[in-house]
Amino acid sequence: MPAFHKALLLFNPVSGAHLELRSTTMRRIAEIFQRSGVEVIAQATHARGSAGDQARAAISEGCDAVFACGGDGTVFEVLQGMAKSSAMMGVIPLGTGNVLAHDLRLTGNSERAAAQLLSFAPHRISLGRIETGGHTRFFTVAAGVGVHAELLYRANARAKQSGGHLAYYSQGARLLFRHAFVPFPVEITTSEGKAVETTALELVAMRVRSFGGPLRHWKPGSSLLSDDLRLVLLRNSNRAHMLRYTLQALTGLAPFDGLEKEDADLSFVSAKSVLCRVPEVRAAQLRVQADGELLGPAPTRIEIVPDALTLLIPPEAGWIGGPLTTQSVSL
C-alpha cells in the first residue's frame, strides 16, 4: 500500500512538452495512483511562483502528499509551500532536468517513476535555507554564489533564443576563460561549531550526492540524509587548474581528499551555515542561485534547517548517505 492516500499532482503547463501531451501524461500518472487506491487531484500551476500556495491550499484541504511533476524549477516552487509542513513531498520528472529525482534514483520515464513512488517511504530530512535580497527560500539540491550562478543567468537568457542545452556548455566555456572572478569574504560555522573566516571566488552549498547529467561522477560527499551543508569553495582563479579539475569532475577523477593547506585551491567543508559578505559596490557583480533558480544579489546567508521536510524516498536508501569531512586540496 502507498504511504499516501490523497495526493495533489502539480505541473507547469507551459514548461517542456506541448500542453496536450503533458496533460495526457498527467492523466496516466493519476491513473497509476488511482489503481492503488489513492485519491488524486491533478492541477496545473496558475502562474509563476503559485505552486507553493497551491501546495499549502491542498494540504489544508486534506492532501497528505504533494507531487512536483516537472523539472528543477517546479520542484523548487512546490518546496516553498511544503517546507515545515507534515505532508509528504514527492517528485516526478516530467520532460526537463530534475536533479532531485536523479538523486532519488527515479527513472526519467514519468509513468514508471510514478509506479516507483508507490513503494517509497516518508522520511523526515533537513533542508537548506537561503536568505538573500530580502527574501528567504528553501532548497533541496544546492545553493551558491559566483560564476556558476552567472552561468545560469547567461545560459537561461541564451536558451530563450536558441532553445538548446548547448547554451550551458558554450556559456560555461566562455566564462571559464573570460569571466573576471570577484573575491568575497565568507564566514562559516562548521558542523563541529567552529567559526572559520576565509575568502572565496566561488561557493556552492550542496545537499544531493551529485548533479547528475555530465557531472554525475562528481560526488563531493553531500547527502540528503545528513544534517549538514557540504560547502565547496574555490579560492584560486588559475584557469588552467580549473579546466583540469573540471575535466576530472566530468570523468569522476576529481580529488576530494588531501592535506589541510592554507593556500588550497579548493576546499570541501561540512557546515551548519555560511555567510557571504559582499561589499555593496561588488554586489551587482555576483549572482546567487538556489536549485537552479536565480535569486537576489549578495550578501547571502545559507544554513541548514533540521526536520524541515517529509520526503518520499526509496525504502532502502542507504546509498543516499555518505561520510562528511572537512578537506582541502590543491589543484
Regions found by a protein language model. Name each.
Residues 182-184, 199-201, 225-230, 270-272:
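A generic structural signal for short beta-strands and their flanking turns/coil linkers
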Residues 144, 148, 204-221, 293-294:
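Glycine-rich phosphate/pyrophosphate-binding beta-alpha loops
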Residues 20, 191-192, 223-226, 233-331:
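ATP/nucleoside-binding phosphotransfer catalytic cores, i.e., glycine-rich phosphate-binding loops
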Residues 74-87:
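Short Gly/Thr/Asp-enriched flexible loops that form oxyanion-binding sites at enzyme active sites
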Residues 14, 27, 35-36, 45, ...:
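Catalytic core of DAGKc-family lipid kinases
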Residues 68-72:
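N-terminal glycine-rich "phosphate-gripper" loop used for MgATP/nucleotide binding
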Residues 159-169, 211-214, 219-241:
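Gly/Ser/Thr-rich active-site loops/lids in small-molecule metabolic enzymes
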Residues 1-66, 76, 111-112, 318, ...:
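ATP/NTP phosphate-donor binding region
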